[in-house]
Swiss-Prot record:
This is Acetyl-coenzyme A carboxylase carboxyl transferase subunit alpha. Gene3D superfamilies: 2-enoyl-CoA Hydratase, Chain A, domain 1. PROSITE patterns: COA_CT_CTER (PS50989). The lineage of its organism: Bacteria, Pseudomonadati, Pseudomonadota, Alphaproteobacteria, Hyphomicrobiales. One of its GO terms (biological process) is malonyl-CoA biosynthetic process.
Length: 320
């Protein structure tokens, strides 16, 4: 789990100052000072400031929130939503990739296959999970698990949180592009319902490889894009400092993507972002996932494939 000490983003400085003042006053109150009324006033002011700030986030600020180090990760959602989770390892071709977690468990009493990118929350775990950037063996593991889920009639849940597939030389030598394509194809071929939730970053093919789903949900302050704002600004303007401008131009927010029909639902985050109340966010995501699976439960295998195929064809026709 992330460090319980709250971390503030640069644009949250006014809120950080108020929270610091509140902490100081609470310390004084613990020493016997009668300042409860003053504390209440500043807490109300801090809450109002946080509400106002998060009601008008820019796309670049949402990018920062999506990357917040204390935002709940894939492992947190699995821990909060999946019981009897049994992770499976390896692609049966090259090796294991811990950037992409996959396994089977129970979601609200029903067996389910779970896939998700895990970024890690400390130096050690970030290195272990390669910062959530999967290699070819990660996507081939995903294909293996999706094929197992299809064989046994189990729905698939994908938790998306990656800056993108790993671009290293070794990954390219082992067929990164082909692995992503095969994983996307496996999603499209599934005869069981699949639901994807973009919980943080949805970066390019690395995300779509497990998010080509019947239903795509997205957290309010998550992002979903073909390339990072920093990389886009470097390519388009030869200047990485234009990342804020790129973020706006690329239409990467949940609000933009819902309007374009790329996603199906926005999950409202707690005031101040998912990291301020992880338990509430995970519970809300669980309810939305359950409803999505219920909505698809009446469809047979052919109808499930047809609905998914038509969904992505419609996106291409609308935005192409």
């Amino acid at each position: 789990m992330p460090d319980p000490m709250r971390s503030y983003l640069d644009f949250e400085k006014p809120v950080a100052e108020l929270d610091s003042k509140i902490d100081e006053l609470h310390a004084l109150a613990a020493g016997g000072s009668n300042i409860g009324e003053e504390i209440a006033k500043i807490e109300e002011k801090a809450l109002a400031a946080l509400t106002e700030l998060y009601a008008a986030l820019t796309p670049w600020q949402k990018t920062q929130v999506a990357r917040h180090p204390q935002r709940p990760h894939c492992v947190d959602y699995i821990e909060g939503l999946i019981t009897e989770f049994t992770p499976l390892a390896g692609d049966r071709k090259f090796g294991e990739d811990e950037a992409l977690i996959g396994g089977f468990g129970r979601f609200r009493g029903e067996s389910v296959c779970v896939l998700g990118q895990e970024k890690g929350f400390s130096t050690e775990t970030r290195l272990k999970h390669n910062f959530g950037m999967a290699r070819p063996e990660g996507y081939r593991k995903a294909v293996r698990l999706m094929e197992m889920a299809d064989r046994f009639g189990l729905p698939v849940l994908s938790l998306v949180d990656t800056a993108g597939a790993y671009p290293g030389i070794g990954a390219e030598e082992r067929g990164q592009a082909e692995a992503i394509a095969r994983s996307t194809e496996a999603c499209l071929k599934l005869g069981v319902p699949n639901v994807a939730v973009v919980i943080g970053e949805g970066g390019s093919g690395g995300a779509i490889a497990i998010a080509t789903a019947n239903k795509v949900l997205m957290l309010e302050h998550a992002i979903y894009s073909v390339i990072s704002p920093e990389a886009a600004s470097s390519i388009l303007w030869r200047d990485s400092s234009k990342a804020q401008e790129a973020a706006t131009s690329m239409k990467i927010t949940a609000q933009d993507l819902l309007r374009f029909g790329v996603i199906d639902q926005i999950l409202t985050e707690p005031r101040g972002g998912a990291h301020r109340d992880s338990a509430a966010m995970i519970a809300k995501a669980g309810d939305a996932i359950a409803k999505s699976f219920a909505d698809l439960s009446s469809l047979d295998s052919d109808a499930i494939r047809a609905q998914r195929r038509q969904k992505f064809l419609d996106i291409g026709r609308k935005l192409g």
